[in-house]
């Protein structure tokens, strides 16, 4: 948290993990894990260089290997605590986890807003879960996620 003119300002940087093996293979990943590719590691290290002058107090990330590896690559050489939380994981796609995207979304199939994947979550579930986690660490935050 940074203080500016008597007001505490909290800045959030929302960063997506680098490319994963499943990204490259066109497979759906939410809660299932897939390691970063060499390109994914390189992407994270490059972002770390671009953010080198940005002061971070703490890093919250999902418990997925790809998120933790991305955070470690970005923050390499910096004394920033990384706090993994399962509540910051991506959307669970349930039975569709690790399936090929082209098989699920063939012929332009689109799922309606609010659709809950069998054994998984819908967008509202994710927003509620992530919001609850962020409010736990920042109780006075005023936040809206859409």
PLM regions and their residue ranges:
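Short coil/turn segments at beta-strand junctions that form active-site/ligand-binding loops
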Residues: 10, 55-57, 141-146
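Loop-to-helix element that buttresses phosphate recognition and phosphoryl-transfer chemistry
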Residues: 19-68, 119-131
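Active-site-adjacent alpha-helix immediately C-terminal to a catalytic or transition-state-stabilizing loop
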Residues: 21-22, 68-69, 78, 132-146
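Phosphate-coordination/substrate-recognition cap region in phosphate-metabolizing enzymes
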Residues: 46-109
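Short glycine/proline- and acidic residue-enriched helix-loop micro-motifs
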Residues: 106-125
């Amino acid at each position: 948290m940074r203080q500016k003119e008597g007001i505490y300002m909290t800045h959030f940087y929302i960063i997506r993990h680098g490319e994963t093996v499943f990204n490259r293979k066109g497979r759906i990943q939410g809660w299932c894990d897939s390691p970063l590719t060499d390109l994914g590691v390189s992407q994270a290290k490059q972002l770390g260089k671009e953010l080198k002058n940005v002061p971070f107090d703490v890093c919250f990330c999902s418990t997925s290997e790809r998120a933790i590896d991305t955070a470690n690559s970005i923050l390499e050489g910096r004394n920033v605590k990384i706090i993994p939380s399962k509540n910051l994981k991506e959307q669970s796609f349930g039975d569709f986890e690790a399936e090929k995207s082209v098989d699920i979304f063939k012929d332009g199939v689109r799922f309606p807003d609010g659709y809950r994947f069998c054994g998984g979550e819908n967008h509202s579930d994710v927003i509620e879960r992530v919001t609850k986690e962020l409010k736990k660490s920042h109780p006075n935050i005023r936040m809206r996620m859409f």
